[in-house]
Amino acid sequence: MDLNKEAFISEINRVFKMNGMASYLNVEKSEKFYLLTERMLTENEKYNLTAITEPNKIILNHYADCATLAAKLKKGASIVDVGCGAGFPTLPLALVRDDLKIVAMDSTAKRVNYVKETAEMLGLTNVTCIVSRAEDAGKDASMRECFDYATARAVAEMRTLCELCLPLVKVGGEMVAMKGKNAEFELAGAKRAISILGGGDVKVEDVVLKNGHDEPLSHPLISIKKRQKTPATYPRAFAQISKKPL
């Protein structure tokens, strides 16, 4: 599928409808997803944003996948997207849920600038972008335990990810990790980290998305409830997190 505007808009509406997410799109949002795709493909060589460049696969693997989070987030929630990279899930989520307040965080200034400029181009006033390491943000009083949710997509293995994300989540909030096929194994090894960092109940949901002509997209979505405050000693410096995971 070439990036033809009419064909793209038809395809994204078809795929969202097929996966029970038709209510997330309207004419304006469909056109903004087209503009997002156009910009991402144009800037891909400069920023190394995605290995997926076929529009139909972008719709399934990036847009529909990120939109699955929309139904799980309470109205008006504050979210920090840890390691936002190319803007996933930040940009699709901000498009389908304009009530959310999303902070896109990454340690790479070049990528943060791309996400910021793209959000501005799309008129997404509910996105704020910051250059920071998650372990530094977790020690910053203006961000520590301030968010309803922390999201992460393909950032790190679970023990490391918990130490980067849970300190940013307020008590009663949730960390939501979009993980790959090793998630259950990683999760089994992260029980101690979850407990130490203030996490509680863990929920694993299998996300399965289809478009009718490519292989279905299937991966686990892990939600961890924040039950108590994270001890002040966490998060540690990244060298310690990497060398001695909890």
Task: Briefly describe each language-model feature range.
Residues 97, 169-171:
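Helix-to-beta-strand junctions that scaffold the AdoMet/dcAdoMet cofactor pocket
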Residues 2-4, 11-76, 80, 113, ...:
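Class I SAM-dependent transferase core
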Residues 188-246:
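SAM/dcSAM-binding transferase cores
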Residues 135, 180-184, 209:
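Short "lid" loop at the C-terminus of a central beta-strand within the Rossmann-like core
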Residues 172-182:
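Conserved beta-strand signature within the Rossmann-like core of class I S-adenosyl-L-methionine
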Residues 53, 131-133, 206:
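Short loop/edge segments at beta-strand edges and connector loops
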Residues 64-156, 162:
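Conserved SAM/SAH cofactor-binding pocket of Class I
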Residues 111-113, 183, 187:
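Short alpha-helix immediately C-terminal to the canonical SAM-binding loop
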